[in-house]
Amino acid sequence: MDFKTFGNIGSPTLLLIPGLGVSYEIFMPLIGLLEERFHVIAVQVDGFTLGQNTEFTSVDDQAQQVCKYIKEDLGGHLDIAYGLSLGGKILSQILERNEVAIEHA
């Protein structure tokens, strides 16, 4: 799993999780619109990471990796999280785990 960051650190934090078979690049038009007002983090889900040989194992594993990133790199807090398709399932698992604070999902 990889995390691509854009925008202004210190601004409200927005996490984007793409769906099955697509990379974070699906969000690039949106990121272009939001990066001036937000600290945007786009997740690169295992198995769909461009230029890397990774393997998708499970939704739970992906959720665990995102939670670890939020705790270690963002102090355990996000302002906004959005998951597209499979990304929504991963986000649901993150919320169910109740390990990090997400204001809006």
Explain the meaning of each model-derived region:
Residues 4-52:
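Conserved HGGG/HGGXW glycine-rich cap/lid loop of the alpha/beta-hydrolase fold
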